[in-house]
């Protein structure tokens, strides 16, 4: 974080004249990070309440503290009162971002946000100093933290925007003010909160609130909800598609090559290019098209963008291929929903191996559609060419039963991680491949931690 005058950073939070021009070099929510000249933002929590550390933060040199309410021992002239700590972070993030002028790409969508963010970063990073959202910092706390990493030398920023409820993307977009927006697709994540995919589409389109007149909005032309959506008149839609040559950017001759994909990219504004990406599945080709469209609509050269995509690196447990004991394990257990499960199984069906196995766990936050979604997953698994399916989790029990009913002979529902690992170890051998996928809360990496030592990783 570059130093910024306190009165500029706190504009809209503190009364006019409250803060002086003292330079602030850090905004933190962690009392252990407090240093002279910082602002400490107190968050109430289940285990710790940041308000309990406010007075100590001032003793250690904090210039100001942001509180939900007055705290004994904290002078009024040092306390910025904001009933909502998240709102305070967003205001300061927006104020800080307004002092710098990098080109910003905002990424949202039901599926593929993080991969598309990573691909966009890879596409852009070779053109200048670039920052991106790290980890899952895609909410009203994480986005300001990302913006605070912008510096004087930063030329580009790629920020991910997540949501659980309507209105959240709008607040994030107004804070980040992206130059280009991306909506990857409209799925069913958080449908329990929003009620329908139409409402999810409206929520994702809130990214337009942060886009200026004429700004490009990169959209999935293969998504029926986006295709029929009423787009705001101030944005310029840029459509991408797998196969539709009428789209602004499309992919033809899509094929798997080793652990990645190859395709012909057709850009109506720039011509045709042969592209390879180190990520499997047609869905990742779509993510690459979105990244390419965003980067080139910033004015970056297609050849450099394509070279960057070839160096893309997947993060965390997102379709990471691990070679263990002569077997390939595709770790894709960072998150899951019906759309990403379907895409993963489609990718896995084409995977070059002797036999294919899958360990699938619960998809969380599906509300009333959870039962039907897990049953449909079982039917999809039965049609995916698997040798055997192992499931874990209470909802995944429905997946196991549906897979059996659909004709998959070898199905095991594991009661714990050890049972899951044992079921796989008893069946798999060198030359086989395993797909591991579930929502983050299922922690399927714990089953892999029991699987790997035995199979020889």
Language model features by range: what are they?
Residues 1-91, 351-353, 379-380, 384-394:
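N-terminal leader/targeting and accessory segments in enzymes
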Residues 79-84, 411-420:
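Short acidic-hydrophobic, aromatic-tinged amphipathic segments that line or gate anion-handling sites
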Residues 45-48, 315, 333-407, 455-457:
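Active-site beta-alpha connecting loops in nucleotide-dependent enzymes
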Residues 107, 316-318, 441-449:
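ATP-dependent carboxylate/acyl-activation modules
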Residues 188-194, 330, 363-367, 436:
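A short acidic, helix-capping loop that chelates divalent metal ions and anchors anionic groups
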Residues 38, 57, 92, 107, ...:
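Residue-level signal for inorganic ion chemistry
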Residues 67, 71-76, 182-328, 353-354, ...:
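Acidic, Mg2+-coordinating active-site environments of NTP-dependent enzymes
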Residues 11, 88-221, 225-233, 426, ...:
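Phosphate-binding loop of NTP-binding sites
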């Amino acid at each position: 974080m570059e130093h910024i005058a306190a009165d500029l950073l706190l504009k809209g939070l503190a009364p006019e004249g409250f803060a002086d021009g003292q330079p602030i070099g850090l905004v933190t929510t962690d009392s252990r990070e407090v240093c002279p000249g910082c602002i400490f933002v107190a968050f109430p929590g289940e285990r710790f309440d940041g308000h309990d550390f406010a007075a100590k933060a001032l003793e250690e040199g904090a210039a100001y503290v942001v509180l939900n309410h007055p705290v004994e021992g904290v002078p009024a002239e040092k306390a910025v009162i904001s009933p909502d700590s998240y709102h305070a972070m967003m205001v300061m993030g927006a104020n800080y971002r307004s002092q710098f002028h990098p080109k910003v790409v905002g990424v949202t969508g039901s599926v593929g946000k993080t991969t598309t963010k990573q691909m966009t970063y890879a596409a852009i990073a070779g053109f200048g100093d670039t920052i991106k959202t790290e980890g899952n910092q895609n909410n009203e706390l994480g986005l300001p933290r990302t913006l605070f990493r912008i510096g004087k030398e930063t030329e580009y920023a790629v920020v991910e925007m997540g949501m659980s409820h309507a209105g959240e993307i709008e607040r994030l977009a107004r804070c980040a003010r992206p130059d280009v927006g991306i909506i990857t697709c409209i799925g069913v994540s958080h449908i329990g909160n929003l009620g329908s995919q139409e409402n999810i589409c409206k929520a994702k389109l809130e990214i337009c609130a942060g886009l200026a007149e004429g700004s490009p909005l990169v959209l999935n032309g293969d998504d029926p909800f986006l295709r029929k959506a009423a787009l705001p008149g101030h944005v310029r839609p840029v459509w991408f598609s797998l196969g539709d040559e009428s789209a602004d950017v499309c992919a033809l001759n899509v094929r798997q090559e080793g652990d990645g994909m190859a395709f012909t990219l057709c850009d109506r504004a720039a011509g045709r290019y042969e592209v390879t990406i180190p990520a499997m599945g047609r869905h990742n080709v779509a993510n690459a098209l979105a990244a390419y469209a965003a980067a080139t609509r910033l004015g970056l050269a297609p050849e450099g963008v394509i070279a960057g995509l070839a160096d893309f690196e997947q993060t965390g447990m997102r379709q990471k291929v691990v070679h263990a004991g002569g077997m390939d394990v595709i770790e894709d257990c960072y998150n899951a929903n019906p759309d990403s499960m379907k895409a993963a199984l489609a990718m896995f069906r084409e995977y070059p191996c002797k036999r294919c196995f899958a360990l699938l766990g619960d998809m969380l936050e599906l509300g009333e559609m959870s039962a039907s979604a897990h049953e449909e997953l079982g039917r999809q698994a039965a049609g995916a060419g698997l040798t055997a399916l192992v499931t874990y989790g209470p909802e995944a029990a429905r997946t196991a039963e549906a897979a059996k009913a659909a004709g998959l002979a070898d199905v095991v529902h594991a009661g714990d991680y050890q049972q899951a690992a044992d079921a796989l170890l008893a069946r798999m051998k060198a030359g086989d491949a395993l797909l591991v996928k579930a929502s983050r809360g299922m922690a399927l990496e714990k089953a892999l931690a029991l699987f790997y030592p035995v199979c020889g990783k």
